[in-house]
């Protein structure tokens, strides 16, 4: 995931295990429990089908239980892209700016079922990875000769009930410049999809979408249905903290 070694990061299942331990301990002692999760991520399913969000919802519905999570500081990070493909469009281009050479980064593209998409990638020098045909569980790697950047593309169907599509794009030895991802509709109803880059702390350089969208930037698990999500504010003037949420 190219997360810098100096940044603390935890697996989702480890957080779930910690919540389970606290819930069990509170039940044994017959005590109320407030779970504060001062962590967040741009990764994973943003819907109600995400594993951590689902588990927190289950725990929070129990008597004497409450879960609180931060909404994150991604509002102005330009790490979210909202796509919309019209019926007459062959594809939509998504431009990603990499401001300096970096070890790598990744992008998660999510689409709600029954939407299905395929992608191609163009490098800053114009070299093209042709459209990778959609195949669930399929993976393809390509090395751009001039940039020496390795790009891998994974197609997955996720979730226990919904079967939403996830396209995972991984850029290793990412070269500076504008990278273009072309999104091709395979089966669409609304034509809507979302892309997310990692959180600021999870990248070792500045990378962002040129046509970013400021909505849907609350970090997981702050988007869970039964979790109280908290944002920041400016203590000097009482206004909202611009990066919050």
Label every PLM stretch briefly:
Residues 1-245:
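Loop-rich non-cytosolic ectodomains and luminal regions
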């Amino acid at each position: 995931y190219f997360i810098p070694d100096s940044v603390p990061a935890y697996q989702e299942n480890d957080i779930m295990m910690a919540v389970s331990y606290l819930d069990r301990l509170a039940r044994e002692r017959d005590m109320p429990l407030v779970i504060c999760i001062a962590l967040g991520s741009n990764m994973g399913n943003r819907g109600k089908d995400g594993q951590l969000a689902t588990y927190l919802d289950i725990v929070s519905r129990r008597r004497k239980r409450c879960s609180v999570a931060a909404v994150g500081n991604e509002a102005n990070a330009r790490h979210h892209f909202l796509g919309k493909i019209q019926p007459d469009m062959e594809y939509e281009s998504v431009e990603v700016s990499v401001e300096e050479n970096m070890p790598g980064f990744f992008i998660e593209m999510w689409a709600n079922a029954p939407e299905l998409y395929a992608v191609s990638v163009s490098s800053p020098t114009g070299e093209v990875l042709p459209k990778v045909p959609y195949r669930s569980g399929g993976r393809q790697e390509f090395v751009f000769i001039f940039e020496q950047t390795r790009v891998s593309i994974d197609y997955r169907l996720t979730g226990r009930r919904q079967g939403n599509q996830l396209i995972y794009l991984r850029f290793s030895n990412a070269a500076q410049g504008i990278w273009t991802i072309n999104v091709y509709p395979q089966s669409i109803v609304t034509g809507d999809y979302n892309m997310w880059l990692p959180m600021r702390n999870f990248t070792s350089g500045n990378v962002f979408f040129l046509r970013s969208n400021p909505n849907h930037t609350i970090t997981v698990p702050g988007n869970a249905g039964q979790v109280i999500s908290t944002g920041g504010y400016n203590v000097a003037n009482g206004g909202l903290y611009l990066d919050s949420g």
